[in-house]
Design a protein with these regions (language model features):
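Low-complexity, acidic/polar, glycine-enriched regions of mature
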Residues: 2-236
Length: 236
């Protein structure tokens, strides 16, 4: 009789473990859905409704809000990797500041500062992971891009169509600085200059590590998505 009772307890225990295991397995897609998704991407410059330039290029330009769809925004795009599945996700912020100098048709100096503490995706849980675990914004609240070599702007059209300019600068994330040499699209739209580009980076070079306690691994290579509106008044 005692042996029979022990066997019954064993069966009940195993059955209970199976139920719990199945329940946890069923929850995995729900957890993944909470932290994964396309995110909020900083899209490239849109020249569809751009107007001819109304302001001389030479002078001091400051980061402005811009006009939809070309508002100032900086963000990231990375792949998230799960067993048998790879999805792309993005985050962005419109908390961008800075200034550049144009002299004799050349961009001679400039720095763009991005407030990372307000970066958002499309999931609150992932927002917290990005800010606190990936970017550690409590210690590194800002990222910067500083121009280190002059760039010729003389070939940028002033008729509201896109031009391309190669910019050389230093990108700093989490206190780690790497040189960037990157072609950017440049648009003169009325009183604004819009600068846009996707900078490919290896997150490991900037000390951005994938935490263990998140639902998906993060690909090493991704993009920093940049779209910055500049004006001489800084108000538009």
């Amino acid at each position: 009789m005692k042996k029979l009772l022990m066997n019954q307890k064993l069966v009940i225990t195993v059955f209970s473990v199976l139920i719990v295991g199945l329940a946890l397995f069923a929850l995995v897609p729900m957890v993944v859905a909470l932290v994964m998704g396309p995110g909020v991407r900083t899209e490239p410059v849109n020249a569809e409704n751009a107007e001819p330039a109304t302001t001389e290029a030479n002078g001091e330009w400051t980061v402005a809000q811009g006009r939809p769809p070309n508002t100032s925004s900086v963000g990231f795009t990375f792949d998230e990797v799960l067993p048998g599945e790879r999805t792309r996700t993005s985050g962005s912020t419109q908390d961008v500041s800075g200034a550049v100098t144009v002299e004799e048709g050349a961009l001679t100096a400039g720095e763009i500062v991005v407030d990372l503490t307000n970066i958002v995706t499309d999931r609150d849980v992932r927002d917290e992971n990005v800010r606190n675990k990936l970017l550690e914004t409590h210690d590194y609240p800002e990222a910067t891009f500083e121009i280190t070599e002059p760039a010729d702007l003389s070939e940028v059209p002033d008729d509201g169509t896109l031009g391309e300019v190669e910019l050389t600068g230093e990108l700093t994330i989490k206190g780690n600085t790497e040189e960037v040499v990157q072609p950017f699209q440049v648009l003169r739209d009325g009183e604004l200059i819009i600068v846009s580009g996707d900078v490919v980076i290896d997150r490991n070079e900037y000390g951005v590590e994938s935490p263990e306690m998140i639902a998906a691994d993060i690909a090493d290579e991704g993009e920093i998505n940049i779209r910055v509106a500049l004006s001489k008044g800084g108000q538009e």
